[in-house]
Amino acid sequence: MVTIRLARGGAKKRPFYQVVVTDSRNARDGRFIERVGFFNPIASGQAEALRLDLDRINHWVELGATVSDRVSALIKEAKKAA
């Protein structure tokens, strides 16, 4: 099953997440089909905290991809900010 979820990057104590479309059987930070955005939970000042390609996310959801709970909340936040 294809899912849209977060893949963790960054350093210890300084997380940075990529929003990726991947097969649910792949490892959290493993192979992915497409990168559709990023989320920086510790962004401050002028740093961009969230960027999502909503067109591509909608495309994958129409094809049957499931969305993780956290990514669903981020999509809601991005739509509110737009």
Swiss-Prot record:
Disulfide bonds: none annotated. This is Small ribosomal subunit protein bS16. One of its GO terms (cellular component) is small ribosomal subunit. The keyword Ribonucleoprotein applies. GO terms for biological process: translation. Belongs to the bacterial ribosomal protein bS16 family. Pfam families: Ribosomal_S16. One of its GO terms (molecular function) is structural constituent of ribosome.
